[in-house]
Amino acid sequence: MTNFQDKPNIRIMFDSLAPTYDKINKILSLGLHLTWNHSFVSLLGRSDHLLDLCAGTGHVALSYIQKYPQASATLVDFSTKMLENVQECHPLAPFSYVISDVTSMPLPNDTFHLASMAYGLRNLSSPLEALKEVHRVLKPKGRLGILELTRPATYNPVHLLHKLYLNLVVPSVGRFYSGNSYAYSYLKESIRNLPCDTSLERVFHKSGLHIIRKRKLLFGTATIWILEK
């Protein structure tokens, strides 16, 4: 399996969302994504440098350097507008920027001890190829942390509430604040179409990355995996 689903031109979509992306996501998640980011950073552990993939507006990298002030980060994203947002809002942050798709990064082999990918896995058109590329740039025993929005299991008591939330709240709030209901309908569909854990973890294994830790957050509405090369 190399494609989770057919993707729209999400580069254009994310460029259009960049000015309001943080505000909308705070509202949509009731601020929980900030708590999840902190949990994610804690599980990533200490490193001098973080490779932040699908970096968006840089919240994970910012949380990381707040926890580890001596660290720096390389932010990779295919959305120019998202990375420009980080540069404008945080001009003094110890960041370098790479505008690139994760499937083909202009980075050398065996370079990074630690990489992160938050809320980006479900947007990859070729997840296996992207993870193989991450494997290429990680040093031996290097680690990749993945934080992703996921679906609670059908037997989970919050499954129905989560489904209603995705179907009704997410597109409505996105339309109200961004004027782009399609983008947040896409968010709903991207979560709904994300394969189950078993299928995802098979892709991880095929890429050469092996799970060393896994944590479910808020009844399975988000999941953290720590993978090792």
Swiss-Prot record:
- Read off the Gene3D superfamilies from this record: Vaccinia Virus protein VP39 (3.40.50.150)
Q: Which domain of life is it from?
A: Bacteria
> What are the coiled-coil residue ranges?
none
Name the pathway.
Answer: Quinol/quinone metabolism; menaquinone biosynthesis; menaquinol from 1,4-dihydroxy-2-naphthoate: step 2/2
Swiss-Prot/TrEMBL keywords: Menaquinone biosynthesis, Methyltransferase, S-adenosyl-L-methionine, Transferase
Cross-referenced CDD domains: AdoMet_MTases
Does Secreted count among this protein's keywords?
no
Recall the GO molecular function terms of this protein's record: demethylmenaquinone methyltransferase activity
Which residues does the record give as S-adenosyl-L-methionine binding sites?
T57, D77, D101, V102
* A Pfam family it matches: Ubie_methyltran
Q: What SUPFAM superfamilies does the entry give? A: S-adenosyl-L-methionine-dependent methyltransferases
**Catalytic reaction annotation:** a 2-demethylmenaquinol + S-adenosyl-L-methionine = a menaquinol + S-adenosyl-L-homocysteine + H(+)
User: Biological process GO terms, please?
Assistant: menaquinone biosynthetic process; methylation
Which InterPro entries does this UniProt record tie to the protein?
A: SAM-dependent_MTases_sf, UbiE/COQ5_MeTrFase, UbiE/COQ5_MeTrFase_CS
Enzyme Commission numbers on file: 2.1.1.163
Question: Could you confirm whether the keyword Cell inner membrane appears in this record?
Answer: no
Family note: Belongs to the class I-like SAM-binding methyltransferase superfamily. MenG/UbiE family.
Job of this protein: Methyltransferase required for the conversion of demethylmenaquinol (DMKH2) to menaquinol (MKH2).
- What name is this protein filed under? Demethylmenaquinone methyltransferase
What is the native source organism of this protein? Chlamydia muridarum (strain MoPn / Nigg)
Starting at the broadest rank, the lineage of the source organism is:
Bacteria, Pseudomonadati, Chlamydiota, Chlamydiia, Chlamydiales
Q: Which gene encodes it?
A: menG
